[in-house]
């Protein structure tokens, strides 16, 4: 799949995960960006601590790479409790979930990533666990089967998803706290890049941090990945110090431009501009023109371009915006103006 090969893919790459854990902030005081989320969570956590209660169940949603897992771990650290981590696809049977729930200590956190991918049978078991701290388990099979209730300690479920709209209403309604993570501002990303450089022992100046941040598509995971690649460049082509000039040279070499676009982003936009006169163009024709699958365009390439105002989806098809023309140094056609 194209997403796995892109330097600017927001999804986690397996070999990155251990390093990412090392540079993640551990407490809210180290957590930069998402100001409203941070302020609200500070209040909710402090209130729960003062009452000696488990924090309400938390749903965190937003695009990949914005720190949902990081925030879940911070919540557990701030509450002074353990966290058990799993994901929706892993919980295939009700017994898988029951094994996790029955091993929780009071006020512990159970973090379920990709919670929108829970199977219906597992989700049914989760409802009474979230609402009443009870677990209904079927023992035996056939006519001899019977249900038993197990009492659970008060716990906090934190669910993370990139697709909040895919959650069922009964599940969504059981979360007392719902937080949406937004793309990060360049200033906040630059701070994150600087902190990561400190943790990794890198020499990085403020201008270098900003150069990396502005090409990171508003996503901390991408920013940290770009930092590691720029570090390689600085060590081999320079004295190891990362300045804005070194960062720009490295990222240009890696084909990540000053808007955070790679070859595929540019290919998509230029196809609309050059082959379809700026659009509108249907996604099937666009897929044929650039040699990609329709699903790749819709799920991988388009979201960031639309969010940043370079592309519009209309009932008649895709349109390149004036901002897209400006990015390529082209004149916007009159009908677009």
From Swiss-Prot:
* Organism this protein belongs to: Tolumonas auensis (strain DSM 9187 / NBRC 110442 / TA 4)
Show the catalytic activity.
ATP + H2O = ADP + phosphate + H(+)
Region described as Small ATPAse domain (RuvB-S):
185-255
Q: What InterPro entries is this protein classified in?
A: AAA+_ATPase, AAA_lid_4, DNA_helicase_Holl-junc_RuvB, P-loop_NTPase, RuvB-like_N, RuvB_C, WH-like_DNA-bd_sf, WH_DNA-bd_sf
One GO CC term, this protein: cytoplasm
Region named Large ATPase domain (RuvB-L)? 4-184
The yes or no answer to whether the keyword Membrane is present is no
Q: What is this protein called?
A: Holliday junction branch migration complex subunit RuvB
Q: What does this protein do?
A: The RuvA-RuvB-RuvC complex processes Holliday junction (HJ) DNA during genetic recombination and DNA repair, while the RuvA-RuvB complex plays an important role in the rescue of blocked DNA replication forks via replication fork reversal (RFR). RuvA specifically binds to HJ cruciform DNA, conferring on it an open structure. The RuvB hexamer acts as an ATP-dependent pump, pulling dsDNA into and through the RuvAB complex. RuvB forms 2 homohexamers on either side of HJ DNA bound by 1 or 2 RuvA tetramers; 4 subunits per hexamer contact DNA at a time.
The domain comment in this protein's record states: Has 3 domains, the large (RuvB-L) and small ATPase (RuvB-S) domains and the C-terminal head (RuvB-H) domain. The head domain binds DNA, while the ATPase domains jointly bind ATP, ADP or are empty depending on the state of the subunit in the translocation cycle. During a single DNA translocation step the structure of each domain remains the same, but their relative positions change.
Tree of life domain:
Bacteria
Q: Which GO terms describe its biological process?
A: DNA recombination; DNA repair
- EC numbers on record: 3.6.4.-
Is Nucleotide-binding set as a keyword in this record? yes
Pfam families named in the record: AAA_lid_4, RuvB_C, RuvB_N
Sites binding DNA sit at 313, 318
Subunit field text = Homohexamer. Forms an RuvA(8)-RuvB(12)-Holliday junction (HJ) complex. HJ DNA is sandwiched between 2 RuvA tetramers; dsDNA enters through RuvA and exits via RuvB. An RuvB hexamer assembles on each DNA strand where it exits the tetramer. Each RuvB hexamer is contacted by two RuvA subunits (via domain III) on 2 adjacent RuvB subunits; this complex drives branch migration. In the full resolvosome a probable DNA-RuvA(4)-RuvB(12)-RuvC(2) complex forms which resolves the HJ.
| Protein's cellular compartments | Cytoplasm
Tell me, in one coarse class, where this protein mainly resides.
Answer: cytoplasm
Q: Which residues bind ATP?
A: 23-24, 65, 68-70, 131-133, 174, 184, 221
Q: In Gene Ontology terms, what is one molecular function of this protein?
A: ATP hydrolysis activity
Supply the alphabetized keyword list. Answer: ATP-binding, Cytoplasm, DNA damage, DNA recombination, DNA repair, DNA-binding, Hydrolase, Nucleotide-binding
The enzyme's main class, written as a single word, is hydrolase
Q: Where is this region: Head domain (RuvB-H)?
A: 258-337
Q: Which family does it belong to?
A: Belongs to the RuvB family.
Binding locations of Mg(2+):
69
């Amino acid at each position: 799949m194209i997403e796995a090969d892109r330097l600017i893919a927001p999804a986690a790459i397996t070999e990155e995960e251990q390093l990412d854990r090392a540079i993640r902030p551990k407490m809210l005081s180290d957590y930069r960006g998402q100001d409203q989320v941070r302020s609200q969570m500070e209040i909710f956590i402090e209130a729960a601590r003062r009452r000696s209660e488990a924090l309400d169940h938390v749903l965190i949603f937003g695009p990949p790479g914005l720190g949902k897992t990081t925030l879940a771990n911070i919540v557990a650290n701030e509450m002074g409790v353990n966290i058990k981590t799993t994901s929706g696809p892993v919980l295939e049977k009700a017994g898988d979930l029951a094994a996790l729930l029955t091993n929780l200590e009071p006020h512990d956190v159970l973090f379920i990533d990709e919670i929108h991918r829970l199977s219906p049978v597992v989700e049914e078991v989760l409802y009474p666990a979230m609402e009443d701290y009870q677990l209904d388990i079927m023992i035996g099979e056939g006519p001899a089967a019977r249900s038993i209730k197990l009492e659970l300690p008060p716990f906090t479920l934190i669910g993370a998803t990139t697709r909040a709209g895919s959650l069922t209403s009964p599940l969504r309604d059981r979360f007392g706290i719902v937080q949406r993570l937004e793309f990060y501002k360049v200033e906040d990303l630059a701070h994150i890049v600087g902190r990561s450089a400190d943790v990794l022992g890198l020499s990085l100046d403020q201008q270098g941090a900003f150069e990396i941040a502005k090409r990171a598509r508003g996503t901390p995971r991408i920013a940290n990945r770009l930092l590691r690649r720029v570090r390689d460049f600085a060590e081999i082509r320079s004295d190891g110090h990362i300045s804005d000039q070194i960062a720009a040279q490295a990222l240009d070499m890696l084909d990540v431009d000053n808007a955070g676009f790679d070859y595929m982003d540019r290919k998509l936009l230029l196809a609309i501009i050059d082959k379809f006169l700026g659009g509108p163009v249907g996604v099937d024709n666009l897929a044929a023109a650039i040699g990609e699958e329709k699903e790749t365009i819709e799920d991988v390439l388009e979201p960031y371009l639309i969010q940043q105002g370079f592309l519009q989806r209309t009932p008649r098809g895709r349109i390149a915006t004036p901002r897209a023309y400006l990015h390529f140094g082209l004149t916007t056609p009159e009908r677009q103006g």
